[in-house]
Every structure is written in C-alpha cells, then in structure tokens.
Amino acid sequence: MKHRVKKHRLSRNSSHRMSLICNLSVSIIEHGRLQTTLAKARALRPFIEKLITKARVPDSLSVRRLLLSRIKNEAAVTKLINEVARRYTDRPGGYCRIVKTGYRVGDAAPMAIIEFV
C-alpha cells in the first residue's frame, strides 16, 4: 500500500532520480518550458517551485550556494536568480503550469508541457 508515501519514484533509484530532476530543472530554467512525460512533470514542479522561492531572497551568497548544491549548473543558477525569480517577487507561489498534450506515439505515455506562468 502507498500510505504516506510522498515522493515520485519514476522507476529509478534515488541518485538517478535526483540527477534526472536536476537535469530537467536546468532545461526548464534555460528554455522556459519543457515537454516531458506527465509523471516527470509532476515530480519536477515541487522541486523547481522550491528553488524559485529560495532564489527570491535578495543577493545572498548562502542562497547561491544552496542552489548550486541542488542543480550544479552555474549559468542556470545565475539565470534563476537574476531573471526567473525577479519575475515572481509579488507572486506567493504557483510559478509553474502543467499542460497535458496527449500521448506519445511510440509507447502511448501521457505527455505534458511544464512552463513558467
């Protein structure tokens, strides 16, 4: 039974799952939107929203270091702090939207686009 299980496992072990989420978050920060499976989009949304909430704090070295420990890409962290987080200074949350786009041709996996609001 799945009582009190909060994580999306995505059929991967923890290190593989974390690197997948980190790579997806770098992609959405760089491009603004991302097409992926619905399960991966649902797993990515809480992770990226927590990063944006942390990045909204004015220039702080500790915040930059925390973000670098999470996504490990200097350019993405800089863009997250300087561009993405500044768009949402007045917004209390809900920075991402998931739009279902149908099913993938090869294996009929449900697909979705995750993008910044």
Curated annotation (Swiss-Prot):
Gene Ontology annotations of biological process type: translation
Subunit structure: Part of the 50S ribosomal subunit. Contacts protein L32.
PANTHER family: LARGE RIBOSOMAL SUBUNIT PROTEIN BL17M, RIBOSOMAL PROTEIN L17
GO molecular function terms noted in the UniProt entry: structural constituent of ribosome
Gene: rplQ
Alphabetical list of SUPFAM superfamilies matching this protein: Prokaryotic ribosomal protein L17
Biological source species: Neorickettsia sennetsu (strain ATCC VR-367 / Miyayama) (Ehrlichia sennetsu)
Name of the protein in question: Large ribosomal subunit protein bL17
GO annotation, cellular component aspect: cytosolic large ribosomal subunit
Keywords assigned: Ribonucleoprotein, Ribosomal protein
Statement: the UniProt record of this protein carries the keyword Ribonucleoprotein: yes
Family, similarity comment: Belongs to the bacterial ribosomal protein bL17 family.
Entry annotated with the keyword Ribonucleoprotein: yes
